[in-house]
Structures are given as C-alpha cells and as structure tokens.
C-alpha cells in the first residue's frame, strides 16, 4: 500500500510539473531566436496585440515609453493619442512582424517583451517611434540590447523638437 501511495504521489507531482511548465509559456512564445507574428491590434503607442502561431499575446515594445492613453486610473497624457495613431500607422492590423527578445521574456504584467521589425521592409518599429518623437527612452536592465540606438534617436528627436518634445514641453 505504501509503495502504491508513493508511486501515485510521484505521478501526480510529475503531472503537475508538466502542466505548470506548459502553462507558463515564457520561453515558448518568443524564443531567444525570435518569432514571426501578425499584428492583431495596437493597444496604445508602446503595446500591441499579436498572434504567434495561433496564440494571442500582448507585446510591450522594449526600450520606449509613449504617453498613456488606456492605463486605468490615469488621464490621457499629452501626445498619447498621436503616439497611438502613429503606432497604428506603422503596424496596421494584419501586418507581419518579426519579434526579437532581449534577456527577459515578460514584464511584471505578463506581457511579452520584444523588439519589433516589420517583415516587409525590416523597419525597426521601436526605434522609429522614438526617432519620430512619439516616445521617450525607457530602459529596464537587463533588457538593453539596443539602448545606444534608442539614446541617439531620443536625443535627435528632442533636439529637433519632434512630436512630444515640441507639443508637451511647456
């Protein structure tokens, strides 16, 4: 009887471990080598919903911060609607993209973290949003693979008074 109970406990433990690892999906959604995806919708200027192999995921663009438009208990911020519209222009519904990871797969809210490139022309979307003045630099180490590019783009946009650097500076 005791052996049967030990075997049953071991089987249940293994089953729970298998289900738990299958449900986390942190590594599976976007491997270190990246993943192809399709844009389902733009949530706001720095968050999009994507389809990766039939699975819908919210994806937070690494390295950038656009003014808020949909954050609960937060008023719409200066240049937020414009930033969201610009991201929608860059990533219309159905756009094929390539997502690259950095060190961390997800943020504290469970969203995937990634660098997004349009499949048709290779445009680095995160960088373009900063370069055109629709986002400020936002870095959370250890996710810093492109920080130098983002710093240069943000400085250039600010010097040129592009986007939020012009509209929200007063």
Kindly label every feature range from the protein language model.
Residues 2-170:
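Small beta-barrel nucleic-acid-binding modules, primarily SNase/OB-fold domains
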